[in-house]
Structure formats: C-alpha cells, structure tokens
Amino acid sequence: MLAFNNIGSLGRLGNQMFEYATLRGIAAKHGYDWMIPPPENGGIENYSLHSCFKLSPDRKEGVLDKCNYVQEPYFHFCDEIFDRCPDNVSLHGFFQSWRYFHNVENELRKDFTFHDSILQPCKDMIDSVDGDPIMLHVRRGDPNLTDPRG
C-alpha cells in the first residue's frame, strides 16, 4: 500500500493535486494499492481535494500507521523514487514534475473533474457573458497570509 499521509500539509490545492497525481502515478507503475487520507485528515484545514474534485471511486481512504516515509530529495524529478519506490511507505514532498504521473494522465483528468456544485456556477457565469470571455489567473498565494502589503 502506497500512501501520502501528510497530503495537504505542504501547500494548497495545486500542491495537493501534484501530491495526489504522484501517488497515483508511482502506485500504478509498480502495481501497488494506494490510499489518501480521509477528508478531515487530522485537522489540516486546507486539505481540499475531496471537496473540489470527483476523485477516483476506487480510492481507499486512510493513513499508513508505523510506516517509513520516502522524502523527495529535491524539487525536480527523482528517477530513484519513481523507478524503485518500495511498497508500504508514505510519500512526502512536493513532487512537482509531470514525469511522476504521465502514466496515469487519463485517470487524473477524470479525477480532477470539479464537483457540479463548483462547475455549474462557473458555466452559468461564462454563459452570461456577452462576447468572448477572457479568464485571468492572478496567483497571490501564501505571502498574503504573512505580508500585510499583500
């Protein structure tokens, strides 16, 4: 069983998506079962995968007790982790490379479908706009929480 016990503790939704995707990709490569923490996940308040996305119905929920952790050693792809990750460990780190999950791309596209309660209001807003809508993403991120200048 491959897990990501601390998913959500290292960042917000984008980081959690990378963590989840990496877990699925490595598990699929080795034929391991995999699981993610349940929605409440020990009180981590920004753990939001469950509330945002229609995650795989095949997922198991829980955390591995008394397990070893596999720590990402740096902020780019690590062949050793992808090619030789042992079973019965929990991943830890950011894992921000598509190479960890390119093998499960189609599954992830399904998993990362927004719940209708999020998607429908967005569709309604887009439909209400005359002309061609333009979307702009402004990343404000963590500095807004600590820097009074925003």
Could you tell me what each predicted segment is?
Residues 8-18, 145-147:
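A short, glycine/small-residue-rich beta-strand->loop->alpha-helix junction that serves as a flexible
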Residues 1-5:
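Extracellular/lumenal mucin-like low-complexity stalks
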Residues 32:
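Short glycine/serine/threonine/alanine-rich loop segments
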Residues 6-9, 88:
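Short, flexible coil/turn micro-motifs enriched in small/turn-prone residues
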Residues 16-28:
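Histidine-anchored nucleotide/phosphate-binding helix
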Residues 39-150:
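Secretory-pathway luminal glycosyltransferase catalytic domains
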